[in-house]
Amino acid sequence: MRERKLRKQLEDLFKRFASVQHGHSDCINIIIAKIKSDQPGESKYARRRRAKSIARCPRCARVSPGFYFTTRCDGKTCRPGLSARPDLLEFIGIDLCVRSK
């Protein structure tokens, strides 16, 4: 149902603002496919947004802002530790291969 409403709204927008009145179905299908995908965004901005929503560093998943005794997270050169919670890393979108570098 939601997809149908979205398709109708996109068709209306394309009809209103596009110079060509036909042939927008391919663009609409691509937009809907991007919205419907279950995978979260992989950009730096998306990772930072998700990390900020749970008050974590987007690079190492440690609590951010840190406590007075936090020494391993500076937000620039930090990496996930050996005992980092995998569920947090997965939510933020930190690839586990980054840990081995």
Swiss-Prot record:
Q: Where are the annotated C4-type zinc-finger regions?
A: 57-78
Q: Which cysteines are joined by disulfide bonds?
A: none
One of the entry's Gene Ontology molecular-function terms is: DNA binding
A Gene Ontology BP annotation from the UniProt entry: symbiont-mediated suppression of host innate immune response
Q: Which UniProt keywords apply?
A: DNA-binding, Host-virus interaction, Inhibition of host innate immune response by virus, Metal-binding, Suppressor of RNA silencing, Viral immunoevasion, Zinc, Zinc-finger
Record flagged with keyword Zinc: yes
The secretion signal range is: none
Q: Where is this region: Basic?
A: 47-50
Say yes or no: keyword rRNA-binding present: no
> One Pfam family from the UniProt entry?
Carla_C4
Which InterPro entries does this one have?
Answer: Carla-bd (IPR002568)
Family to which the UniProt record says this protein belongs: Belongs to the carlaviruses nucleic acid-binding protein family.
Q: What does this protein do?
A: Suppressor of viral-induced RNA silencing. The potential mechanism of action is based on sequestering siRNAs.
Write the protein's name.
RNA silencing suppressor
Q: Which organism is it from?
A: Carnation latent virus (CLV)
